[in-house]
């Protein structure tokens, strides 16, 4: 019995740099305002605003995509949107394959994507980084793409369970 497990987080260097640069200006303006002699900003307001900015930016690092493939099906969780693993059993799947995709062109970027605002024909995507995903087409017609950084391992385990797709 083969099992595929993967956990991904938003840890890309470019994202960290972008987020750091995006908070420099607001924090700089806030510090400058607080440092003025006749400021109306209290210490509590300053600290609360500073913590608010930092927490809102750092929140993205709590996101985690967990994927598991086993004899029961394909399980996924995108925390904080899903608090537990969601399972798609093999009997619900019409087809599954690992493929390259264009995150921005096909789904509008990374994260929990798809639905009414983007290309409905592509279905939904749950991804953290990269351009490789596990593409599922379900028997009810819905499509789901789950991003992966472990292409060969995912293919190997999926090949083991393809006979379970009826």
Set out the residue ranges of the language-model regions.
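Hydrophobic alpha-helical transmembrane segments
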Residues: 39-51
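Short aromatic/basic micro-patch
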Residues: 68, 87, 145-148
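ATP/adenylate-binding site constellation spanning eukaryotic-like Ser/Thr protein kinases
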Residues: 71, 90, 151
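Non-transmembrane, membrane-adjacent beta-strand/coil modules in membrane-associated proteins
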Residues: 77-142
């Amino acid at each position: 019995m083969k099992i595929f497990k993967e956990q991904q987080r938003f840890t890309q260097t470019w994202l960290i740099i972008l987020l750091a640069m995006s908070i420099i200006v607001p924090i700089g303006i806030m510090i400058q305002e607080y440092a003025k002699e006749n400021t109306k900003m209290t210490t509590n307001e300053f600290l609360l605003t500073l913590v608010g900015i930092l927490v809102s930016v750092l929140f993205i690092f709590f996101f985690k995509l967990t994927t598991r493939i086993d004899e029961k099906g394909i399980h996924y969780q995108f925390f904080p949107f899903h608090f537990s693993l969601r399972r798609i059993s093999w009997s619900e799947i019409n087809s599954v394959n690992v493929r390259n995709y264009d995150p921005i062109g096909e789904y509008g970027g990374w994260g929990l994507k798809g639905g009414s605002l983007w290309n409905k024909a592509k279905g939904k995507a749950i991804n953290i980084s990269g351009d490789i995903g596990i593409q599922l087409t379900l028997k009810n017609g819905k499509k789901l793409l789950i991003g992966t950084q472990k292409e060969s391992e995912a293919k190997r385990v999926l090949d083991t369970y393809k006979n379970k797709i009826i």
